[in-house]
Each structure stands twice: as structure tokens, then as C-alpha cells.
Amino acid sequence: RARGNRVVYMSGDAIIAAQGKETYSILLTDIPITRGGTISFQVENAMASIGAAWALNLSWDVIRTGLRSFNNDPDSAPGRFNVFDYRGATLIADYGHNPDAIAALTKAVQAMPAKRRMVVISAAGDRRDEDIRQQTEILGTAFDDVLLYQDACQRGRADGEVLGLLRQGLVGATRTSHVEEIHGEFVAIDTALARLQAGDLCLILL
């Protein structure tokens, strides 16, 4: 900024875009995908979007309108942190299947209120063993219940191999107290929904 370059950064409860003495401010409460700034990776996405739109010389009215009107619902962004209410519980659907994504999702979930946290997860068989294990290593620090399911397509893995790796990642888990293996994605989701109570949170990894 001191050199007169454009910068985008977060300050307090707003995202700031500045160049020299020219400054624009957008409150996080005006950017729905950030859920008031509690979802850090969505704050980063919003900052990147602001920077890209500014570089294209879009007007700030257009940028603000775009940020205010974009929601990460199933119609706008399917499988990207879609949040639903279900009988007083919170459901989140996301297509995160690598350790970095799982870490970001876990951090986001920890910022949301919940009496009990549950996650439904499988893993792609064409990932490295350590990447599959690491996903549940991360989840085991933040979720009370972990429901493991075997996907219909194992991508070259033997029957039960992916489930075994996911279970290995939960050895020594600091928070998880309930682990269940289920065959079939939809059966696993139905099982999770049946266990949910008002005030719970369930992350479903599609």
C-alpha cells in the first residue's frame, strides 16, 4: 500500500480494499457466505473475489451487490458448505476430500454453536494412504460422532480398505467417542439424520 499498490485485507469486522488514500470497506455481515466472518475460508474467498473484480475495474456498486447477493446454497454452489436446518439441528454438506479442505471445514465448524458434532465421511480410493488417514486424524479432534461409509466406487481399492485407513486415522482421537462403519452413502446419511437432536451439528462430506 505504501508503494501505491492495491491491497485487500481484513480489519475488524470488515474487508478493506485500499490504494493510496482511496479506501473501500465492506462489512462481513454484508457478505452472506462468510456467515458474519465466522467462516474463515469464505472470508478468504471473498477477499480474492474482491481483488479480482477490482482488477477488472468493476464498479464498487457492482462488487458490493455481487457479494451481498451470492449465497452458498445448493442452487448457487452445490456441495460448497451448504447449510440447512433440520429439526433444530444444523446440517452442512460439502465436497471436501483432502486434508487441507478437511482442516478448513473443521475450523469453520468449530466456530459454529453445537451441542454435539457429527460427521459423515468416506474417501476417494485413489488418494495416498496418508492423505486418507490424515482426514480422520483431523476430524477426530473436533467431532463427537464419526460415521464412516464405503462409497460404491472404490477407485482401485480392495473392499474395506478405505474404511480401514479412515479408522486408523481415528486411533487416539481426542474428541471422537462414537465411530460407526456403514456401507452406502445414503444409508450413512439416513443414519446420521436419525441420530441428530436439536442443537446438534452434522457435516456431511459428499
Regions found by a protein language model. Name each.
Residues 41-45:
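Conserved phosphate/anionic-ligand binding catalytic regions in large, soluble enzymes, centered on
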Residues 23-39, 51-206:
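ATP-dependent carboxylate-amine ligase
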